[in-house]
């Protein structure tokens, strides 16, 4: 295994030594196995290629302050992948198989778990693909489950900072009752045109609901969080603060967002999931995107070019989002007690 400079490791793919694979044929899953071969022998008419029959996940393992490794909420990822599989008429990966594959990937790549204090983590990309050859439209009956581990650098190489977002009304990431609630590649591919256009402007992209283009759906590939206060924007007590996040059948239920909502309630905040009109940003003191990659990505402003409107939230991350960010990171790195049972500790 090549030497890795953890201090300069970026947020990108790094080749692991082993990946884990399992196959589904004749109605049953094989045993998972480790392999150094990173290439698939795949028929050109496989349903994953012809019709996009695939789903994936993303989760992390952290080297804690005590030197132990913690895997964060992998069971929730297993359950979400099962829902995605059912949504695309694929054989769900049993939770037990999912967990075994994650642990095998970790055991076979222990030297890829970054040291504590680097901000880097070991990322796992579980992937489920349809492999049955088909030309006629229809689902496959054979599937491959793969876990790809890769060490990744911190989302914020320096200081926890803000990002600017721009509103997009011309591209719909997912339909209200389509695949938006599942973690499938087509949702992300559908957003590339809009997100790349935003990146060329130095921004990221907010998607609105596909039906009316009125309500906030997602921030690029992440859930949206808004913080509302009943009086002065940044000076108030917690019982006067509301944590807002969209409720929609077109967005992916974020495990990070679910964790943050739990922590927000413990802080005494009111937590609300509902449809959020874009104009309600005017009433928010803080806003952010949230997900596995970044945990929380604070927003300094949202630009609505069509309405010639800019919503400002401050050039620095707000106090509520900052507290939530550090509280969750402290749990993941073992700096505070995990009272929720979110992490599974491995003494390595």
Residue ranges and their predicted role:
Residues 1-101, 105, 127, 134-234, ...:
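Helix-start/capping segments and mature chain N-termini
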Residues 115-129:
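Extended, Lys/Arg-enriched charged tracts that mediate electrostatic binding to polyanionic substrates
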Residues 95-97, 105-119:
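Charged, gly/pro-rich active-site loop segments
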């Amino acid at each position: 295994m090549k030497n890795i400079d953890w201090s300069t490791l970026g947020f990108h793919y790094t080749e692991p030594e082993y990946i884990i694979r399992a196959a589904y044929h004749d109605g049953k899953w094989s045993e998972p196995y480790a392999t150094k071969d990173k290439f698939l022998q795949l028929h050109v008419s496989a349903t994953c290629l012809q019709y996009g029959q695939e789903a994936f996940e993303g989760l992390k393992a952290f080297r804690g302050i005590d030197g132990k490794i913690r895997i964060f909420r992998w069971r929730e990822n297993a359950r979400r992948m099962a829902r995605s599989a059912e949504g695309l008429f694929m054989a769900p990966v049993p939770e037990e198989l999912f967990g075994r594959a994650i642990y095998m990937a970790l055991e076979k790549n222990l030297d890829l778990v970054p040291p504590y204090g680097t901000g880097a983590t070991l990322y796992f990309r579980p992937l489920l693909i349809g492999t049955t050859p088909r030309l006629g439209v229809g689902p496959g009956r054979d599937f491959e489950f793969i876990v790809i581990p890769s060490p990744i650098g911190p989302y914020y190489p320096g200081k926890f900072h803000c990002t600017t977002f721009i509103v997009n009304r011309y591209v719909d990431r997912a339909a209200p009752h389509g695949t938006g609630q599942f973690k499938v590649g087509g949702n992300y591919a559908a957003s590339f045109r809009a997100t790349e256009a935003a990146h060329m402007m130095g921004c990221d992209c907010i998607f609105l609901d596909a039906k009316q283009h009125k309500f906030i759906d997602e921030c690029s590939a992440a859930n949206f969080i808004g913080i509302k206060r009943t009086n002065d924007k940044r000076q108030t007590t917690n019982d006067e603060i509301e944590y807002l996040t969209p409720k929609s059948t077109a967005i992916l239920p974020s495990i990070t967002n679910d964790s943050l909502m739990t922590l927000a309630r413990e802080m005494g905040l009111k937590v609300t999931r509902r449809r959020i009109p874009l104009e309600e940003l005017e009433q928010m003191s803080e806003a952010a995107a949230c997900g596995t990659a970044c945990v929380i990505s604070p927003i300094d402003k949202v630009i609505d070019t069509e309405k010639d409107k800019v919503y400002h939230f401050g050039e620095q991350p707000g106090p509520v989002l900052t507290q939530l960010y550090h509280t969750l990171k402290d749990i993941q790195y073992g700096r505070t007690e995990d009272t929720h049972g979110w992490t599974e500790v491995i003494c390595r």
